[in-house]
């Protein structure tokens, strides 16, 4: 679990997302409250439930990006799903219980990786020993006494020399033959609605049939070291302990990001008599959000302390169009602002992995130095903003389209400009995009 303070979380989010301070603060406080709750003594700890968040804002302003970055910071099981993927129980489609099943799978993988990192050093030593056994087989005892001891001493000295060379990477390209455990290949079985548990049991039964088989393979030492390290680390893990920790991690620290929640409101589907009931999906989500117990292949999982963050553009619907019970389960409401020209400028240059830095790095691979003048950045931002206003407002995603069109010729002919510098100023932007951005019909299709 992350032990970062709210200020530190916001500072990290600022490196990747421009503006939206209210949303960042709400998410940072919610994440910090997970840690605070763990410091509270029982039985009060059980009574403290997370305050779920509803993020409201147009598309392309950072709702999903905040969730994505939060996942990396949280160091906790995290899943992002679209609410539109789910249907009411009884209809063809996924039911909402699969959210928790997917989350526990993520947690098991995360916990396994954490536990494997703890034993990796020891596993690497054992993997090196197995490789050295192939390169330098143990000498057979032919003589007696001193001669055998002398042979063993020589072999140990040689092994140490080879181990040093192995660690320095001098033997990486040498090929050896090894018996390597085969990874189990899962079977894909289509699950009928409501029978996911039975399908999961059948799948695990079939996957266990092939486990433990070894195959003799010829591999390079670099790859062999990785395969054997993973194999040795897996042997050291206690699977039951991993499952228990994973379930506990989901129950105490799990985060579910429900995207497009506005698309399952009744306002969005008025008059659709033959449609799957969206209100039914809301009613199915309700017990999950307020706390229930879901049966998974790793055991029973309680959802009482899982944090739910929902988001939606709410163009056609309002948060009040959600069923009242579900509205009450998202007490923290945060509105995200539409992006201004200044925001677009900052998105282009101010973030850690800004679009400008990405394109500069891509063209640098072909020895083309791409320079952006301040007036060029300003003009790009103005065009992106203007096209959003005139056509459909897709937020920051418009910048991808605009900059891709702008650099189309440079990217295509990069090989001919090796060793040269290309400066993008306002005049260059106007030449490349001026006509397209002014013509509304053209910009609808091109930008």
Swiss-Prot record:
It holds the Pfam family AAA_2. ATP binds at residues 18, 60-65, 259, 325, 397. One of its GO terms (cellular component) is HslUV protease complex. Keywords: ATP-binding, Chaperone, Cytoplasm, Nucleotide-binding, Stress response. The keyword Disulfide bond does not apply. The keyword Kinase does not apply. GO terms for molecular function: ATP binding; ATP hydrolysis activity; peptidase activity; proteasome-activating activity. It is found in: Cytoplasm. It comes from the Bacteria. Its main location: cytoplasm. GO terms for biological process: protein unfolding; proteolysis involved in protein catabolic process. Belongs to the ClpX chaperone family. HslU subfamily. A double ring-shaped homohexamer of HslV is capped on each side by a ring-shaped HslU homohexamer. The assembly of the HslU/HslV complex is dependent on binding of ATP. NCBIfam families: hslU, PRK05201.1. ATPase subunit of a proteasome-like degradation complex; this subunit has chaperone activity. The binding of ATP and its subsequent hydrolysis by HslU are essential for unfolding of protein substrates subsequently hydrolyzed by HslV. HslU recognizes the N-terminal part of its protein substrates and unfolds these before they are guided to HslV for hydrolysis. This is ATP-dependent protease ATPase subunit HslU. It comes from Burkholderia thailandensis (strain ATCC 700388 / DSM 13276 / CCUG 48851 / CIP 106301 / E264). The lineage of its organism: Bacteria, Pseudomonadati, Pseudomonadota, Betaproteobacteria, Burkholderiales. The gene is hslU.
């Amino acid at each position: 679990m992350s032990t970062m303070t709210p200020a530190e979380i916001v500072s990290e989010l600022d490196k990747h997302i421009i503006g939206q301070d209210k949303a960042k603060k709400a998410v940072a406080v919610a994440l910090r409250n997970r840690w605070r709750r763990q410091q509270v003594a029982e039985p009060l700890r059980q009574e403290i439930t997370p305050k779920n968040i509803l993020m409201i804002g147009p598309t392309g302003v950072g709702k999903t990006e905040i969730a994505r970055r939060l996942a990396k910071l949280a160091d906790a099981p995290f899943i992002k799903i679209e609410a539109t993927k789910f249907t009411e129980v009884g209809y063809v489609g996924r039911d909402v219980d699969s959210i928790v099943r997917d989350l526990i799978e993520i947690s098991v993988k995360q916990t396994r990786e954490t536990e494997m990192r703890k034993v990796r050093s020891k596993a690497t030593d054992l993997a090196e020993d197995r490789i050295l056994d192939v390169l330098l087989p143990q000498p057979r005892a032919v003589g007696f006494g001193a001669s055998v001891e002398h042979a063993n001493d020589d072999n140990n000295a040689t092994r140490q020399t080879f181990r040093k060379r192995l660690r320095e990477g001098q033997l990486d390209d040498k090929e050896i033959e090894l018996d390597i455990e085969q990874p189990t290949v899962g079977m894909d079985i289509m699950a009928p609605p409501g029978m996911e548990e039975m399908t999961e049991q059948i799948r695990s039964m079939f996957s266990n049939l092939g486990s433990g088989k070894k195959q003799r393979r010829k591999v390079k030492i670099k790859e062999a070291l990785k395969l054997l390290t993973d194999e040795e680390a897996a042997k050291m893990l206690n699977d039951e302990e991993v499952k228990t920790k994973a379930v506990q991690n989901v129950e105490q620290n799990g985060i579910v990001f429900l995207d497009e929640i506005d698309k399952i409101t009744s306002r969005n589907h008025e008059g659709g008599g033959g449609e799957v009931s969206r209100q039914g999906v809301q009613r199915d989500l309700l017990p999950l959000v307020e706390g229930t117990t879901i049966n998974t292949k790793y055991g029973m999982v309680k959802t009482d302390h899982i944090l739910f963050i929902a988001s939606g553009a709410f163009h056609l619907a309002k948060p009040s169009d959600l069923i009242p019970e579900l509205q009450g389960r998202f007490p923290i409401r945060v509105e995200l602002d539409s992006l201004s020209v200044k925001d677009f400028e900052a998105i282009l240059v101010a973030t850690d992995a800004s679009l400008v830095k990405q394109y500069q790095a891509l063209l640098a691979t072909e020895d083309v130095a791409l320079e952006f003048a301040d007036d060029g950045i300003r003009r790009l931002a103005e065009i992106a903003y203007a096209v959003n206003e005139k056509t459909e407002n897709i937020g920051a995603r418009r910048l991808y389209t605009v900059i891709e069109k702008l650099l189309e010729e440079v990217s295509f002919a990069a090989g001919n400009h090796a060793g040269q510098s290309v400066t993008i100023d306002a005049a260059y932007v106007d030449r490349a995009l001026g006509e397209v951005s002014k013509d509304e019909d053209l910009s609808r299709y091109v930008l």
